[in-house]
Amino acid sequence: MGKKEKVNALEFSVNKGIFTKTRLKSLYSDFTSLFIKNPEGFLANVNTWREAIETSAWSGKLNSRIILVFDETFESAFSSPALGRPLSLGAVAAYWIQQGVWLRKQDFLNDCKKGNLVREDGFSIFSILRWSFQKLGFQNQASSILSNRSPSGQYVIRKNIEKLACLVHNEAMRRCSSYTSAIYTWDFFQDTFGSLYWEEGKLNKDEMECLLNWMCYQKHVLIFDSKIIKFLPNSQIDAQLASIDKSIDGSVADLIQARASIAQRSEFLNEELEQLSQVLNQAVKKGEKTIAITYLRRKKILSKDLERKVSSRLQLDTIISNIDNAVDNKILLIAMSSGSEALDAILAQMGGTEKVEDVLENVNDTLARSEEIDATIQTYNPQNIDLEDEAVEKEWQDLVAEEQKVEDIVSTLGNVSLKTPSDTFTLTNTDSDKKTSKPEKIQAELVEQ
């Protein structure tokens, strides 16, 4: 990314709420001694500075979004009219470099290629070794922090480069609908993603190198060489898709770059034609015939040039489309070949049609024998088993009659009063002789029985 005009990263950090006015004096003071006297206070300050630096870089307030250079320009970006320049930036840089959060560019590239990098919140054998060396005294952590000297060289911000790589990859996958749409030249890559994610339009050589190495060796989402950048598909069907073919991919890259150049030129011609139309209309209104004719001739020349550009682009689109179709057919052929091999293997395991016929014949024989056995069992009925035997029927009728008799007796008793006549009322001798209640008669009969 090219150099930007001076911006006040301090004001940006205050507006974001990263720096609070109550803490500014402490943040801009020399707090290196807190590393020993008050470790918690030191850690609070360096954490705040880290957030301010990384956020300012990502938002374009520093010279790069992903690489830090602790030079005069960097310090000026955080200068304060009231407090001057921060006095502990050297200690802040030394601390986060030792923590592996900001990595020297060459170390970053080497670790990417070796696969040594992990997430900042993760563990690896290398982080364990670094911690062990610090404990054993092989690294004098305190001396570099207390010296408060700004380190030289370029340092990669891991958090920011991972964020940028994620955005670029997501956009590339959104655009990737065919084989050729995954291939970029370096310039086409810059033109495609630059307008979206870096306002300057171009990543410088160092930034491109860091970004591509991270995405290639650490995230495994693309491959690249000095000319071609190729995003990898999510599913690997053909090994060719996961490698750069110098002849095929090189030709595709040339076609894509040519199409992009023609599209850019066509856009410029359209804008120029629109301007000429406006000027021509003004000349016609003013009656300036000579000027109007000049503009009209110029417009016709540009219109023919635009037609040629459109025709050329259509030809390139046709070639690119045919390449995509050929690749699709190749993938389809590979899939069909794999399916045919799988089908052959399954048929071989089945033993051919003769074995299938033998199996089916055995199945039919087994079913026939099973049906014969079932029919034999169903027809079996010994002579001494007779469910309609007269003795059984007579015994059943006797049981029913006995049950009915019991129910009648219970029903009759339910209607008999157990009270004596004296308990209810007193009858005269005449009435007693003349009338006897029906319940009493039934009760007397039952007693006699």
Curated annotation (Swiss-Prot):
GO cellular component: cytoplasm; cytoplasmic side of plasma membrane; ESCRT III complex; mitotic spindle pole body attachment site; multivesicular body
InterPro entries, sorted: Snf7_fam
Basic and acidic residues composition-biased segments: 431-443
Effect of gene knockout: Suppresses slow growth rates of spores and severe nuclear envelope (NE) morphology defects of vps4 mutants.
Superkingdom of the source species: Eukaryota
Start-end of Polar residues biased regions: 421-430
Gene3D superfamilies registered for this protein in UniProt: 6.10.140.1230
Family under the similarity heading: Belongs to the SNF7 family.
Stated name of the protein: Charged multivesicular body protein 7
